[in-house]
Design a protein with these regions (language model features):
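N-terminal alpha/beta PP-like core and its mobile active-site loop of ThDP/TPP-dependent enzymes
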Residues: 1-346, 357-368
Protein backbone atom coordinates (compact mmCIF):
# COMPACT_ATOMS: atom_id res chain seq x y z
CA UNK A 1 0.00 0.00 0.00
CA UNK A 2 1.22 3.50 -0.80
CA UNK A 3 2.36 5.56 2.21
CA UNK A 4 0.27 8.57 1.17
CA UNK A 5 -2.78 6.27 1.08
CA UNK A 6 -2.02 5.22 4.66
CA UNK A 7 -2.03 8.88 5.65
CA UNK A 8 -5.40 9.43 3.95
CA UNK A 9 -6.79 6.38 5.76
CA UNK A 10 -5.49 7.67 9.08
CA UNK A 11 -7.24 11.02 8.62
CA UNK A 12 -10.50 9.18 7.92
CA UNK A 13 -9.98 6.88 10.90
CA UNK A 14 -9.66 9.93 13.16
CA UNK A 15 -12.77 11.46 11.53
CA UNK A 16 -10.87 14.50 10.33
CA UNK A 17 -13.26 16.01 7.80
CA UNK A 18 -11.32 19.14 6.84
CA UNK A 19 -7.64 19.97 6.48
CA UNK A 20 -5.89 23.01 5.04
CA UNK A 21 -2.99 23.48 2.66
CA UNK A 22 -1.43 24.33 -0.68
CA UNK A 23 -0.30 21.71 -3.17
CA UNK A 24 3.25 21.59 -4.49
CA UNK A 25 5.62 19.03 -5.96
CA UNK A 26 6.74 18.10 -2.45
CA UNK A 27 3.30 17.01 -1.19
CA UNK A 28 1.42 16.07 -4.38
CA UNK A 29 1.16 12.38 -3.44
CA UNK A 30 -0.54 13.22 -0.13
CA UNK A 31 -3.02 15.56 -1.83
CA UNK A 32 -3.80 12.93 -4.45
CA UNK A 33 -4.39 10.15 -1.92
CA UNK A 34 -6.64 12.29 0.28
CA UNK A 35 -8.69 13.35 -2.75
CA UNK A 36 -9.07 9.76 -3.95
CA UNK A 37 -10.04 8.56 -0.47
CA UNK A 38 -12.90 11.04 -0.57
CA UNK A 39 -13.42 11.39 3.19
CA UNK A 40 -11.35 14.44 4.11
CA UNK A 41 -11.88 17.70 2.26
CA UNK A 42 -8.77 19.77 1.57
CA UNK A 43 -9.41 23.50 1.93
CA UNK A 44 -6.89 25.22 -0.34
CA UNK A 45 -5.72 28.55 1.05
CA UNK A 46 -3.62 31.32 -0.51
CA UNK A 47 -0.59 31.04 1.77
CA UNK A 48 0.92 28.37 4.01
CA UNK A 49 0.75 30.68 7.01
CA UNK A 50 -3.01 30.78 6.44
CA UNK A 51 -3.09 26.96 6.38
CA UNK A 52 -1.51 26.78 9.84
CA UNK A 53 -3.72 29.60 11.13
CA UNK A 54 -6.80 27.81 9.78
CA UNK A 55 -5.64 24.57 11.40
CA UNK A 56 -5.66 26.18 14.83
CA UNK A 57 -8.84 28.19 14.23
CA UNK A 58 -10.58 24.94 13.31
CA UNK A 59 -9.65 23.53 16.70
CA UNK A 60 -10.70 26.71 18.50
CA UNK A 61 -14.15 26.62 16.88
CA UNK A 62 -14.80 22.89 16.45
CA UNK A 63 -12.66 21.37 19.18
CA UNK A 64 -11.19 18.86 16.70
CA UNK A 65 -7.54 18.35 15.86
CA UNK A 66 -6.77 18.76 12.17
CA UNK A 67 -3.75 19.22 9.90
CA UNK A 68 -1.97 21.66 7.61
CA UNK A 69 -0.35 20.37 4.43
CA UNK A 70 2.79 22.20 3.30
CA UNK A 71 5.19 21.58 0.46
CA UNK A 72 8.96 21.84 0.61
CA UNK A 73 11.17 24.94 0.64
CA UNK A 74 9.30 28.21 0.99
CA UNK A 75 6.09 26.23 1.42
CA UNK A 76 7.41 25.04 4.77
CA UNK A 77 9.08 28.25 5.88
CA UNK A 78 5.88 30.17 5.13
CA UNK A 79 4.02 28.11 7.70
CA UNK A 80 6.27 28.95 10.63
CA UNK A 81 4.39 32.01 11.90
CA UNK A 82 1.21 29.94 12.14
CA UNK A 83 3.10 27.21 13.96
CA UNK A 84 4.56 29.67 16.48
CA UNK A 85 1.06 31.03 17.03
CA UNK A 86 -0.26 27.54 17.79
CA UNK A 87 2.73 26.91 20.06
CA UNK A 88 2.17 30.13 22.03
CA UNK A 89 -1.55 29.49 22.48
CA UNK A 90 -1.22 25.73 23.11
CA UNK A 91 -3.33 24.72 20.11
CA UNK A 92 -2.94 21.11 18.91
CA UNK A 93 -2.51 20.23 15.26
CA UNK A 94 -0.35 18.30 12.81
CA UNK A 95 1.75 19.99 10.17
CA UNK A 96 2.58 17.51 7.41
CA UNK A 97 5.28 18.87 5.13
CA UNK A 98 6.56 17.39 1.92
CA UNK A 99 10.21 17.46 0.96
CA UNK A 100 12.75 16.71 -1.73
CA UNK A 101 13.68 13.06 -2.33
CA UNK A 102 15.19 11.75 0.91
CA UNK A 103 18.48 11.12 -0.88
CA UNK A 104 18.97 14.88 -0.99
CA UNK A 105 17.96 15.64 2.58
CA UNK A 106 19.37 12.64 4.44
CA UNK A 107 22.86 12.45 2.97
CA UNK A 108 25.59 15.07 3.01
CA UNK A 109 23.98 17.13 5.76
CA UNK A 110 27.02 19.36 5.88
CA UNK A 111 26.02 20.71 2.47
CA UNK A 112 24.04 23.93 2.67
CA UNK A 113 21.45 22.51 0.26
CA UNK A 114 21.33 19.73 -2.31
CA UNK A 115 18.20 18.91 -4.34
CA UNK A 116 15.53 21.50 -5.08
CA UNK A 117 14.80 23.38 -1.85
CA UNK A 118 15.45 20.22 0.17
CA UNK A 119 16.37 20.93 3.77
CA UNK A 120 15.70 19.74 7.33
CA UNK A 121 12.46 21.56 8.15
CA UNK A 122 11.77 19.66 11.43
CA UNK A 123 15.06 20.95 12.84
CA UNK A 124 13.95 24.46 11.96
CA UNK A 125 10.76 24.18 14.07
CA UNK A 126 12.02 21.93 16.85
CA UNK A 127 11.83 24.73 19.45
CA UNK A 128 8.22 25.66 18.63
CA UNK A 129 6.61 22.23 18.36
CA UNK A 130 5.89 19.44 20.81
CA UNK A 131 7.42 16.98 18.35
CA UNK A 132 9.09 17.29 14.95
CA UNK A 133 10.43 14.46 12.84
CA UNK A 134 11.63 13.79 9.32
CA UNK A 135 10.55 10.37 8.06
CA UNK A 136 13.34 8.54 6.25
CA UNK A 137 11.93 5.01 6.51
CA UNK A 138 8.59 4.40 4.78
CA UNK A 139 7.64 1.74 7.33
CA UNK A 140 7.65 4.42 10.06
CA UNK A 141 5.57 7.06 8.26
CA UNK A 142 2.24 5.98 9.76
CA UNK A 143 3.87 5.60 13.19
CA UNK A 144 5.11 9.19 13.12
CA UNK A 145 1.74 10.60 12.03
CA UNK A 146 -0.02 8.61 14.77
CA UNK A 147 2.52 9.76 17.34
CA UNK A 148 2.14 13.39 16.32
CA UNK A 149 -1.64 13.19 16.58
CA UNK A 150 -1.57 11.75 20.10
CA UNK A 151 1.23 14.00 21.37
CA UNK A 152 -0.51 17.14 20.14
CA UNK A 153 -3.21 16.77 22.82
CA UNK A 154 -1.21 14.93 25.48
CA UNK A 155 -0.62 17.15 28.50
CA UNK A 156 -0.28 20.76 27.43
CA UNK A 157 -1.44 20.80 23.80
CA UNK A 158 0.59 22.13 20.90
CA UNK A 159 1.52 21.60 17.25
CA UNK A 160 3.58 18.69 15.91
CA UNK A 161 5.45 18.68 12.58
CA UNK A 162 6.07 15.59 10.44
CA UNK A 163 8.19 15.94 7.30
CA UNK A 164 7.78 13.24 4.63
CA UNK A 165 10.05 13.37 1.55
CA UNK A 166 8.29 12.74 -1.75
CA UNK A 167 9.88 9.34 -2.36
CA UNK A 168 8.67 8.19 1.08
CA UNK A 169 5.15 9.41 0.29
CA UNK A 170 5.09 7.41 -2.94
CA UNK A 171 6.71 4.27 -1.50
CA UNK A 172 4.71 1.05 -1.38
CA UNK A 173 4.80 -0.77 1.95
CA UNK A 174 3.34 -3.90 3.48
CA UNK A 175 0.80 -2.47 5.89
CA UNK A 176 1.25 -5.39 8.26
CA UNK A 177 4.94 -4.61 8.61
CA UNK A 178 4.46 -0.90 9.27
CA UNK A 179 5.22 0.28 12.78
CA UNK A 180 2.20 1.45 14.80
CA UNK A 181 2.29 3.94 17.65
CA UNK A 182 0.83 2.71 20.93
CA UNK A 183 -0.96 4.99 23.39
CA UNK A 184 1.06 3.29 26.12
CA UNK A 185 4.18 4.83 24.57
CA UNK A 186 3.07 8.35 25.50
CA UNK A 187 5.32 9.90 28.16
CA UNK A 188 4.04 10.22 31.71
CA UNK A 189 2.81 13.69 32.55
CA UNK A 190 4.21 13.68 36.10
CA UNK A 191 1.55 16.04 37.37
CA UNK A 192 0.55 16.18 41.03
CA UNK A 193 -0.66 12.88 42.46
CA UNK A 194 -4.35 12.48 43.29
CA UNK A 195 -3.51 12.79 46.99
CA UNK A 196 -1.48 15.95 46.40
CA UNK A 197 -4.22 17.47 44.23
CA UNK A 198 -6.84 16.64 46.86
CA UNK A 199 -4.72 18.32 49.55
CA UNK A 200 -4.27 21.40 47.34
CA UNK A 201 -8.00 21.64 46.72
CA UNK A 202 -8.64 21.46 50.47
CA UNK A 203 -6.13 24.28 50.99
CA UNK A 204 -7.85 26.44 48.38
CA UNK A 205 -11.25 25.83 49.97
CA UNK A 206 -9.86 26.91 53.34
CA UNK A 207 -8.30 29.98 51.73
CA UNK A 208 -11.67 30.87 50.18
CA UNK A 209 -13.30 30.61 53.63
CA UNK A 210 -10.71 32.96 55.06
CA UNK A 211 -10.67 35.42 52.16
CA UNK A 212 -12.61 38.68 52.09
CA UNK A 213 -11.84 39.59 48.46
CA UNK A 214 -11.29 36.44 46.36
CA UNK A 215 -10.99 36.41 42.59
CA UNK A 216 -10.96 33.68 39.92
CA UNK A 217 -8.77 34.31 36.86
CA UNK A 218 -9.98 31.91 34.17
CA UNK A 219 -7.67 31.00 31.30
CA UNK A 220 -7.76 29.28 27.93
CA UNK A 221 -6.36 26.09 29.48
CA UNK A 222 -9.87 25.47 30.84
CA UNK A 223 -11.23 25.28 27.31
CA UNK A 224 -8.35 23.10 26.15
CA UNK A 225 -9.48 20.35 28.55
CA UNK A 226 -13.18 20.84 27.77
CA UNK A 227 -14.11 22.28 31.17
CA UNK A 228 -15.67 25.60 30.16
CA UNK A 229 -19.15 24.20 30.89
CA UNK A 230 -18.19 24.06 34.59
CA UNK A 231 -17.47 27.78 34.90
CA UNK A 232 -21.02 29.00 35.49
CA UNK A 233 -21.31 26.55 38.39
CA UNK A 234 -17.88 27.51 39.73
CA UNK A 235 -18.61 31.24 39.80
CA UNK A 236 -22.20 30.91 41.00
CA UNK A 237 -21.54 28.33 43.70
CA UNK A 238 -18.72 30.26 45.37
CA UNK A 239 -20.24 33.65 44.47
CA UNK A 240 -16.74 34.85 43.62
CA UNK A 241 -15.90 37.57 41.05
CA UNK A 242 -14.03 36.39 37.96
CA UNK A 243 -11.79 37.67 35.19
CA UNK A 244 -11.06 35.91 31.90
CA UNK A 245 -7.92 35.90 29.77
CA UNK A 246 -7.80 37.01 26.13
CA UNK A 247 -8.19 33.55 24.63
CA UNK A 248 -10.87 32.64 27.17
CA UNK A 249 -13.06 35.68 26.70
CA UNK A 250 -16.04 33.73 25.33
CA UNK A 251 -15.98 30.91 27.89
CA UNK A 252 -18.36 32.85 30.14
CA UNK A 253 -21.05 35.35 29.21
CA UNK A 254 -19.49 38.82 29.34
CA UNK A 255 -22.73 40.09 30.90
CA UNK A 256 -22.55 37.65 33.80
CA UNK A 257 -22.93 39.81 36.94
CA UNK A 258 -19.77 38.37 38.49
CA UNK A 259 -17.53 38.60 35.42
CA UNK A 260 -15.50 41.80 35.32
CA UNK A 261 -13.76 41.44 31.99
CA UNK A 262 -10.05 41.11 31.32
CA UNK A 263 -7.03 42.50 33.10
CA UNK A 264 -3.61 43.43 31.82
CA UNK A 265 -2.14 45.86 29.33
CA UNK A 266 -5.06 45.54 26.95
CA UNK A 267 -7.72 44.76 29.53
CA UNK A 268 -10.45 46.95 30.98
CA UNK A 269 -9.66 49.38 33.79
CA UNK A 270 -12.43 47.80 35.83
CA UNK A 271 -10.78 44.39 35.54
CA UNK A 272 -7.41 45.78 36.55
CA UNK A 273 -8.85 47.44 39.65
CA UNK A 274 -10.55 44.19 40.66
CA UNK A 275 -7.30 42.28 40.12
CA UNK A 276 -5.11 44.69 42.06
CA UNK A 277 -7.46 44.83 45.06
CA UNK A 278 -8.21 41.15 45.62
CA UNK A 279 -6.72 39.30 48.59
CA UNK A 280 -6.86 35.81 47.06
CA UNK A 281 -6.16 35.26 43.37
CA UNK A 282 -6.95 31.81 41.97
CA UNK A 283 -5.57 31.45 38.44
CA UNK A 284 -6.76 28.42 36.46
CA UNK A 285 -5.32 27.49 33.07
CA UNK A 286 -3.49 30.75 32.35
CA UNK A 287 0.24 31.02 31.70
CA UNK A 288 0.41 34.41 33.43
CA UNK A 289 1.64 36.18 30.31
CA UNK A 290 3.53 39.45 30.70
CA UNK A 291 0.84 41.26 28.72
CA UNK A 292 -1.58 40.29 31.49
CA UNK A 293 0.50 40.60 34.64
CA UNK A 294 3.17 43.14 33.68
CA UNK A 295 6.93 42.77 33.95
CA UNK A 296 7.14 42.92 37.73
CA UNK A 297 5.42 39.94 39.35
CA UNK A 298 5.68 41.43 42.83
CA UNK A 299 3.49 44.33 41.71
CA UNK A 300 0.68 41.94 40.76
CA UNK A 301 -2.20 41.87 43.27
CA UNK A 302 0.21 43.07 45.96
CA UNK A 303 -1.94 42.12 48.97
CA UNK A 304 -3.10 38.78 47.58
CA UNK A 305 -2.12 35.19 48.08
CA UNK A 306 -1.81 33.72 44.59
CA UNK A 307 -2.77 30.19 43.57
CA UNK A 308 -1.96 28.96 40.07
CA UNK A 309 -3.26 25.77 38.48
CA UNK A 310 -1.32 24.71 35.38
CA UNK A 311 -0.62 21.40 33.69
CA UNK A 312 2.85 22.63 32.67
CA UNK A 313 5.26 22.59 35.61
CA UNK A 314 7.62 24.96 33.82
CA UNK A 315 4.93 27.64 33.88
CA UNK A 316 4.54 27.16 37.63
CA UNK A 317 8.28 27.50 38.16
CA UNK A 318 8.35 30.79 36.27
CA UNK A 319 7.16 32.81 39.28
CA UNK A 320 7.23 30.14 41.98
CA UNK A 321 8.51 32.50 44.68
CA UNK A 322 5.42 34.68 44.27
CA UNK A 323 2.84 31.89 44.33
CA UNK A 324 1.57 30.61 47.64
CA UNK A 325 -0.11 27.64 45.96
CA UNK A 326 1.40 26.00 42.86
CA UNK A 327 -0.85 23.21 41.60
CA UNK A 328 0.44 21.07 38.73
CA UNK A 329 -2.83 19.62 37.48
CA UNK A 330 -5.42 19.41 34.74
CA UNK A 331 -7.78 22.40 35.01
CA UNK A 332 -10.85 20.18 34.72
CA UNK A 333 -9.72 17.90 37.54
CA UNK A 334 -9.10 20.92 39.75
CA UNK A 335 -12.46 22.58 39.06
CA UNK A 336 -14.38 19.35 39.53
CA UNK A 337 -12.55 18.79 42.82
CA UNK A 338 -13.33 22.32 43.95
CA UNK A 339 -17.02 21.84 43.21
CA UNK A 340 -17.24 18.42 44.87
CA UNK A 341 -18.67 17.97 48.37
CA UNK A 342 -19.31 21.65 48.97
CA UNK A 343 -21.52 22.93 51.74
CA UNK A 344 -21.84 26.57 52.77
CA UNK A 345 -19.88 29.40 51.17
CA UNK A 346 -18.75 32.81 52.34
CA UNK A 347 -20.67 36.01 51.94
CA UNK A 348 -18.62 38.30 49.71
CA UNK A 349 -21.34 40.93 49.22
CA UNK A 350 -19.14 43.83 50.33
CA UNK A 351 -16.39 42.82 47.90
CA UNK A 352 -18.89 42.35 45.08
CA UNK A 353 -20.30 45.82 45.77
CA UNK A 354 -16.78 47.24 45.48
CA UNK A 355 -16.27 45.41 42.17
CA UNK A 356 -19.58 46.77 40.90
CA UNK A 357 -18.44 50.27 41.78
CA UNK A 358 -15.32 49.71 39.70
CA UNK A 359 -17.52 48.61 36.81
CA UNK A 360 -19.75 51.67 37.20
CA UNK A 361 -16.89 54.16 37.51
CA UNK A 362 -14.72 52.59 34.80
CA UNK A 363 -17.17 51.23 32.19
CA UNK A 364 -16.02 49.17 29.21
CA UNK A 365 -17.77 51.65 26.93
CA UNK A 366 -18.49 55.21 27.96
CA UNK A 367 -22.20 56.09 27.91
CA UNK A 368 -23.46 58.30 25.11
CA UNK A 369 -24.62 61.66 26.43
Amino acid sequence: MKVSDLIADFLAEKEIRHIFGIIGAGNAHIFDSIFKKGYTEIICVHHEQAACMAMQTYFRTCGKVTAALLTTGAGSTNGITGVVSAWADSIPGIIISGNENSKYVEMHKDLRMWGVQGYDSPAMVSKVTKYSKQVLDANFALYEIQKAFELSTHGRPGPCWIDIPMNIQSANVNQEKCEKFKISDLPELNTDSLASLSASISSIKKALKKSKRPLFWLGHGIRLVGAEHLLEDLISHFNVPALVTWAGIDMVDSYHPLVYGRAGTYGQRCGNFVLQNCDLLICIGTRMAISQIGYEINELARDADIAVVDIDKLELNKYKNRYKYSINADAKDFIEGLLANNSDTNNYSEWISTCNEYRKNYPWVNPID
